[in-house]
């Protein structure tokens, strides 16, 4: 004798009610063979719906055994039970339980999505089933556009999507008029004739009369189990349905299909509540805009400061006489000489070196007298300091060798001495009674350190030493380190060379790289501090996302129950709500980045000294941050959704 398809042995189901348990099913034993059409009849509260839920693996016995084929359901995990519902059972509910935002075809396709069927195959089968049930012209209609009988036929098509070896119909005609109810019963009998096992739960004796076997239940006990000799036809000869579901796609394709469905459902849910979605995203938008903008402003400010430092000579090392800044004996030390600069310039780590000596002297041009800082420098001075010429040229090695009486002046000196004359080249000025020809004017530069009003004049250091200052020693030497050479190592080598030349430590160095590092470190610290403040708004936005997702789970509890009934696993439900949370956050992140880019334009209208500098890294980080917020703050609502009991979820309005 063949093993029963469904077999319950001494099944009891209790539900807690305060301090006591209410027994809904009491010691029920029942077997149903493949291919039968069975009616379970009883009054309201008799336990017939609970029995159907246990038969469909939506609920579980408190005690006793329930076997589907050779499988004991009490030994199965939740995902294995979902697979049983997905591959063996098809549910037809009294209230249809169609998702209102999906079309008829999309509702029918749902079980195949969770079964991993390819999109084209499941759409083809859904249309075939709807056509078979006389709904080919209603495939694109939503449930609200269908009559009750049409909605129930869509529900039947959904039950058949994956094959529907066992059809469980809970009061299938309860909400229909007599004609529609008769049509539904006719369809169920036809399905039984095709090999489907059909179980009808009803309180209507007229509906039960169409079944070959009638099981009566009262107060949780089976009080009758009889064959119905008045039913037309006979049960199907074979329990195997000739209507197999669509072929499964490969695992990767199935996963992609489920993810695409989750994303589509997330999009539908977000669009259907536009204002709520916008308000939910607002915290994320503000947070991402703040973080990206602050990082861009900080990067722009840092680059601007580094450029300004570059204007006074980056990658340079200055050598001064004395032990350190403020050394009282520094003026008496006269060992720093031009030969030291020449020796340093020959080192492989040095790009160029220039001696420097300076005094404040009187300048005269015609009847105009002014005080200016006169500096004697080498021919590489302007290269070392990164200074450009607005007019004329700088002096070269020949002028240095000849102690030439030539001078380069800055823009401030040009304005003071020459006023409206835009071209002072070739004019002769007196520097402390030494006539010098102006051969160049340096370009004016705006500085973050303020626009200096000092007057500066540069002459060859040989001219300054021999003709102006009357001294052979230098005030300082500026060394420009070759590109690619580590500044710290160059400073160590420079110090070693100077010690060898002087025989003692009568000098000290000042590395501009330390200024650069200080600026970079300060900029990074400020950016980090401001970013942490901005991140607070991201956290607040994330909490907002979590709150709204919890509300969404509550609102869509019945939808979750429907999806579980048609075979969705806990992971599928969790994925759907996680995708929704991540989608909200990614949309907020994208809008935040766009707003930040727009802010850079507005920023440039009010601040002309530097610009906001965006990097691909900061934008990618913003998207990753949005995704992380969606996952972290969407996890709890998604987990709550996945842990809902299918029966409780279906009972929610």
From Swiss-Prot:
Which residues are the signal sequence here? Answer: none
GO biological-process terms attached to the record: response to antibiotic
| PROSITE patterns, A to Z | ABC_TRANSPORTER_1, ABC_TRANSPORTER_2, MACB
List membrane-spanning regions: 278-298, 526-546, 587-607, 616-636
Any single Gene Ontology cellular-component annotation: plasma membrane
Q: Which residues form a coiled coil?
A: none
Localization of this protein: Cell inner membrane
Q: Domain ABC transporter spans what residues?
A: 6-244
Name the major location: membrane
Return the similarity comment: Belongs to the ABC transporter superfamily. Macrolide exporter (TC 3.A.1.122) family.
What is the protein's known function? Non-canonical ABC transporter that contains transmembrane domains (TMD), which form a pore in the inner membrane, and an ATP-binding domain (NBD), which is responsible for energy generation. Confers resistance against macrolides.
Quaternary structure per UniProt? Homodimer.
The molecule here is called Macrolide export ATP-binding/permease protein MacB
The organism is: Burkholderia thailandensis (strain ATCC 700388 / DSM 13276 / CCUG 48851 / CIP 106301 / E264)
Q: Which gene encodes it?
A: macB
